[in-house]
């Protein structure tokens, strides 16, 4: 076990993130794991999705729209 010093504002932010049963080490560990998340693991999750179809329709509609002044 080690002792570290942190600023008061950082302590308050960690405290806000902390669940009652969590230790501060748990909170810091969760934050470190988030940083390591590889965005490539989400590649293709919307494939064959109706949501993706709607997004594509919206983008195409925006591209073909003309500005009115």
UniProtKB/Swiss-Prot annotation:
The keyword Cell inner membrane does not apply. Pfam families: VAPB_antitox. This is Putative antitoxin AF_1481. Coiled coil: none annotated. InterPro entries: Put_antitoxin. Possibly the antitoxin component of a type II toxin-antitoxin (TA) system. The keyword Zinc does not apply. Belongs to the UPF0330 family. It comes from Archaeoglobus fulgidus (strain ATCC 49558 / DSM 4304 / JCM 9628 / NBRC 100126 / VC-16). Keywords: Toxin-antitoxin system. It comes from the Archaea.
């Amino acid at each position: 076990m080690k002792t570290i010093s942190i600023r008061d504002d950082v302590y308050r932010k960690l405290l806000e993130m902390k669940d009652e049963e969590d230790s501060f080490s748990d909170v810091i560990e969760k934050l470190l794991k988030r940083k390591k998340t590889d965005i490539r693991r989400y590649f293709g999750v919307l494939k064959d999705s109706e949501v993706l179809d709607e997004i594509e329709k919206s983008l195409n509609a925006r591209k073909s729209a003309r500005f009115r002044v």
